[in-house]
């Protein structure tokens, strides 16, 4: 269980390359990672919404709040309430599991309220007309489309492993 892992044992972990080769780099803290990224890139703090206040405190201290993206499956009202607690906020991107009832309902809520976030992460396990319709609405509404290509189950099999093991243009070409 993750909760049984100590901070010291995590700090002893060595990072690996995408192909599993060990590097000389140790597991950084969030603060260390953000210090390296400052004024360079946008950072997706995955699974970070549950820790929004803690992450925001670190980003504000480091002056990187405008570079941080937090994703989640929260209602528009919940996000608005959380953002109202702070004078400055990180970017928020809704995750839409468009083939699931909760995902369809969340997307409909954003559409009905006329809220156009910077981007939506649209997830699907099989490409269907409903997926295409959602993507078309995202783009037509002025938002960007984010596809999580790390796992096949989030992008209908159009993932990085499929691209690496086959023709990248064939896989990624379907996403752009």
Task: Locate each region found by the language model.
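Metal-dependent phosphodiesterase/phospholipase catalytic core, i.e.
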Residues: 1-90, 94
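C-terminal active-site rim and adjoining tail of enzyme catalytic domains
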Residues: 101-176
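Solvent-exposed loop/turn segments at secondary-structure junctions
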Residues: 48-52, 74-77, 98-99, 125-128, ...
């Amino acid at each position: 269980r993750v909760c049984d892992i100590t901070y010291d044992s995590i700090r002893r972990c060595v990072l690996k390359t995408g192909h599993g080769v060990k590097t000389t780099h140790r597991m950084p803290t969030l603060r260390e990672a953000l210090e390296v990224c400052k004024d360079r890139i946008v950072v997706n703090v995955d699974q970070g919404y549950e820790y929004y206040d803690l992450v925001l405190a670190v980003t504000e201290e480091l002056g990187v709040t405008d570079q941080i993206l937090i994703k989640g499956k929260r209602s528009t009202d919940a996000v608005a309430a959380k953002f109202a607690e702070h004078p400055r906020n990180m970017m928020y991107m809704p995750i839409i599991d468009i083939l699931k009832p909760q995902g369809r309902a969340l997307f409909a809520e954003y559409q009905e309220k006329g809220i156009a976030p910077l981007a939506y992460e649209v997830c699907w396990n099989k490409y269907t007309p409903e997926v295409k319709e959602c993507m078309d609405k995202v783009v037509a509404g002025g938002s960007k489309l984010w596809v999580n290509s790390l796992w096949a189950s989030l992008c209908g099999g159009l993932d990085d492993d499929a691209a690496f093991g086959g023709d990248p243009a064939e896989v990624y070409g379907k996403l752009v």
